[in-house]
Amino acid sequence: MLYHENFDVIVVGGGHAGTEAALASARTGQKTLLLTHNIDTLGQMSCNPAIGGIGKGHLVKEVDAMGGLMAEAIDHAGIQFRTLNASKGPAVRATRAQADRALYKAYVRNALENAPNLTLFQQSVDDLIVDQDRVVGVVTQMGLKFQAKAVVLTVGTFLGGKIHIGMESSSGGRAGDPPSIALADRLRELPFRVDRLKTGTPPRIDARSVDFSVLEAQHGDNPTPVFSFMGKREHQPRQIPCFITHTNEKTHDVIRNNLDRSPMYAGVIEGIGPRYCPSIEDKVMRFADKNSHQIFIEPEGLTTHELYPNGISTSLPFDVQVQIVRSMKGFENAHIVRPGYAIEYDFFDPRDLKQTYETKFISGLFFAGQINGTTGYEEAAAQGLMAGLNASLHSQGKEGWSPRRDQAYMGVLIDDLSTMGTKEPYRMFTSRAEYRLLLREDNADLRLTEKARELGLIDDARWARFNEKIENMETERQRLKSTWMNPNSAGIDELNKLLKTPMAREASGEDLLRRPEISYSDLTQLDAFAPALEDQQASEQVEIQVKYDGYIKRQQEEIEKSLRHEHTKLPADLDYKDVKGLSNEVVAKLTEAKPESIGIASRISGITPAAISILLVHLKKHGLLKKGEEE
């Protein structure tokens, strides 16, 4: 049966990737359909109740700068906000927030239900309609056919999902939800490389059964940071603490004595789990020298007693889970509300994607989220937004767009996935970015909002506020450049108290702000440089841009230099064994990958900057560099 109306874009799945994909497509004016197996689970946090963190917070800020929802939703649902790495440089500072699951999900659903150009429909998808290597629609579980110019699959852990608790396993997309078997089988018929991954979740605990008096409280920041560019502290709900406990030798003995009942160690689970979020049994075995592991006790919300013990993800049998939990300080009488479990699922090699998230084999078909081998809400949201945007552009017959590695962590994400692929669940870290001084949380809007406006993702209110901030920054920098003090100026005594050595010659406000011992707040408390900007976002940018000016310029020069060789062609018949100085490992990797350009070669795992320099010397020596590429 054919549905009575057609769509420009269909998004399959209503998780963090699917919601951003659907909203991005709808925001650009395309008639969009979001299909989900259950409308009540839209925006659900299937694992930990938190948004952000190192690298991840950067992605959330970028999604926000592109008009996405995640930052706005967590600002309305966050029950504890913190800035991580606050004492370090701005490049690695990151925002993280605990979420009230119910508030977060309700905010997301409300945004979806009220979005213009977006239709919701509750049905699982069993099949794709493909016409000569071009997707033209989908078929739902009840045989209903929907037609569209582009389809975005954001199916999370549902493709062939299998849940494990001890040696018992069952089919499922997550606890309480059925898997997507028919669609998984259909996708396996297409020319994609497919494999299995695994993730897991800890048991949930009833807070009323925990002795908090013996736990260490962990409070949020005051004042609280805000995620969204348009966010306000008054949007945030009541703030509450998290708590910390630890595993101990008793915990570890329980785990070691029951490894034969672990599906992971018994070989029942084939999928590879996330390296940076291992199960507790994996941690105990991999770090055998450690006597304890820190466990963060995270509230699931303001109106529930459920706790999320971050750090004891497990697939051990339920009776062992009870022993593990009750071995920890404060949890001697703990009651488990929901058992922990592991889940295996299909993912598709992201090297079969273009940089727009469109698949190389099926035109108009886009993948986003865990289907691409990633882990994490933030990584999913970033992919979803970009896939939804590019599906919209495809449906309009326009060229796709993706940021470069030097423009956004979103660019690092798709570039890593599409050039290197992944064998384990991929998560974002600031260390993955070569130009992280330029890719800060605080300047996500400056990097991306103008382009997002051009692409139709930014509304008038945000655009006006963005331009106001730019104007405030430019005016303030000009004021500081043109305001001077000398050793005889009024107020010099107050200034000298701030300086390591007394002022010896005339200096502008900008000169003084470059000094590490003087902050913008210090400077603008002096009469000569008062008043401070009321726009705190603008004043923060002024301070960072002035203090890091030299480093920023140096990194921009590095980018310009690297871009000169980004598209330098590598001959298809180049025999890498003839390139003197390359290691056998590098020769083998380049021979297998056959990269088309220096830029692609540079991003193959294991190809070092030194190897790229050797390649450039070889190309120059044999006259294979074009004019302008030889520097």
UniProtKB/Swiss-Prot annotation:
Q: Does the keyword Flavoprotein apply?
A: yes
One of the entry's Gene Ontology molecular-function terms is: flavin adenine dinucleotide binding
Which of UniProt's keywords are assigned here?
A: Cytoplasm, FAD, Flavoprotein, NAD, tRNA processing
Cellular-component GO terms for this entry: cytosol
Q: Does the keyword Flavoprotein apply?
A: yes
Q: Please cite one Gene Ontology biological process associated with this protein.
A: tRNA wobble uridine modification
**Quick one: which residues bind FAD?**
G13, G14, G15, H16, A17, G18, V125, S180, Q370
**Which cofactor does this sequence's record say it needs?**
FAD
Which annotated residues bind NAD(+)?
273-287
Database matches in InterPro entries: FAD/NAD-bd_sf, GIDA_C_N, MnmG, MnmG-rel, MnmG-rel_CS, MnmG_C, MnmG_C_subdom, MnmG_C_subdom_sf
Where in or outside the cell is it found? Cytoplasm
Family the UniProt entry places it in: Belongs to the MnmG family.
The subunit field of the Swiss-Prot or TrEMBL record says: Homodimer. Heterotetramer of two MnmE and two MnmG subunits.
List, alphabetically, the HAMAP family matched: MnmG_GidA
Q: What role is this protein assigned?
A: NAD-binding protein involved in the addition of a carboxymethylaminomethyl (cmnm) group at the wobble position (U34) of certain tRNAs, forming tRNA-cmnm(5)s(2)U34.
Name assigned to this protein = tRNA uridine 5-carboxymethylaminomethyl modification enzyme MnmG
Q: Which organism is it from?
A: Vibrio campbellii (strain ATCC BAA-1116)
Q: Which gene encodes it?
A: mnmG
